Swiss-Prot record:
Family matches, as Gene3D superfamilies: Aldolase class I
Residues engaged in binding D-glyceraldehyde 3-phosphate: R163
Binding site for D-ribose 5-phosphate: D22, G151, G212, G233, S234
PANTHER family per the UniProt record, alphabetical: PYRIDOXAL 5'-PHOSPHATE SYNTHASE SUBUNIT SNZ1-RELATED (PTHR31829:SF0)
SUPFAM superfamilies: Ribulose-phoshate binding barrel
Active site: K79
Disulphide-bonded residues: none
Subunit structure: In the presence of PdxT, forms a dodecamer of heterodimers.
Protein name in the entry: Pyridoxal 5'-phosphate synthase subunit PdxS
Catalytic reaction(s) noted: aldehydo-D-ribose 5-phosphate + D-glyceraldehyde 3-phosphate + L-glutamine = pyridoxal 5'-phosphate + L-glutamate + phosphate + 3 H2O + H(+)
Gene that specifies this protein: pdxS
Keywords of the record: Lyase, Pyridoxal phosphate, Schiff base
Length: 292
């Protein structure tokens, strides 16, 4: 079990410094791969459309996932509902590369997340804070991402979540060893993971940014805040020029600390996706609060 998990963590580590893009067709997947994406997320609808349509959002049709998988050579991810281990079993049977237990889809279980140790395939999970991140890792997640607020084109929540996680990690590194058990209780997280973070000053898995990233500047901002890479959902194919936007965001993640290059890649992209002021959303319409 531990050998398999170490392999899964290493697979996620190989995506570090890259961009993972949401795609809904094989054609979009090819655009993403040509632009330099390190992986794609196969979906029936991007988060902006899921948000607009409402209702219950479920795992994508296996036919769509298989078509996207056949179109590209880079890893393909797909989403399942929180707690829906049967959807995860189906995706594992399809030979998908990573499963995202995602708050963007309608939760199937409001009490329990999936036991990710029961699967051979690596899992990605969202987190708003260090406690959530360590609980998901304790369940077997090989990769963490900020939850942000998907489908809004508004990066503010992703920034908030990344800053919170980083601040809580920094705090752990200042504690004495005899204070770590109390910290584990406070975080509601496994003691061994809390101790690891305190000793190493980082999560034991990669932590990507996700949720509301709509421009190259957004992507570079998240990288400068300490993200290991970036997920872009609606920001590519809801923009005016998806091909140019995809290439620009990949370059922005690579050269995130080079303002001259960021200025160059941000030029002439056309209009970014339509955005939403998160303050105007009802509590029931917030995805990030799903899960615990």
């Amino acid at each position: 079990m531990n050998e398999r998990y170490e392999l899964n963590k290493n697979l996620a580590q190989m995506l570090k410094g890259g961009v993972i893009m949401d795609v809904t067709t094989p054609e979009q997947a090819v655009i993403a791969e040509k632009a330099g994406a390190v992986a794609v997320m196969a979906l029936e609808r991007v988060p902006a459309d899921i948000r607009a349509r409402g209702g219950v959002a479920r795992m994508s049709d296996p036919k769509i996932i298989k078509e996207i998988k056949a179109a590209v050579s880079i890893p393909v991810m797909a989403k399942v509902r929180i707690g829906h281990f049967v959807e995860a079993q189906i995706l594992e049977a399809l030979g998908i590369d990573f499963i995202d237990e995602s708050e963007v889809l309608t939760p199937a279980d409001e009490m329990y997340h999936i036991d990710k140790w029961a699967f051979k395939i690596p899992f990605v999970c969202g987190a708003r804070n260090l406690g959530e991140a360590l609980r998901r890792i304790g369940e077997g997640a090989s990769m963490i991402r900020t939850k942000g607020e998907a489908g809004t084109g508004n990066v503010v929540e992703a920034v908030r979540h990344m800053r919170i996680i980083n601040a809580e990690i920094k705090r752990l590194t200042t504690l004495r060893e005899d204070e770590l058990m109390a910290a584990a209780k406070e975080l509601q997280a496994p003691y061994d993971l809390v101790k690891y973070v305190a000793q190493h000053g980082r999560l034991p898995v990669v932590n990507f940014a996700a949720g509301g990233i709509a421009t190259p500047a957004d992507a570079a901002l998240m990288m400068q805040l300490g993200a290991d890479g970036v997920f872009v959902g609606s920001g590519i194919f809801k923009s005016q020029n998806p091909e140019k936007m995809a290439e620009a965001i990949v370059k922005a993640v690579t050269y995130y600390d080079k303002p001259e290059i960021l200025a160059e890649v941000s030029e002439g992209l056309g209009e970014a996706m339509q955005s939403i002021d998160i303050r105007k959303l009802d509590e029931k319409d917030l995805y990030a609060s799903r899960g615990w």
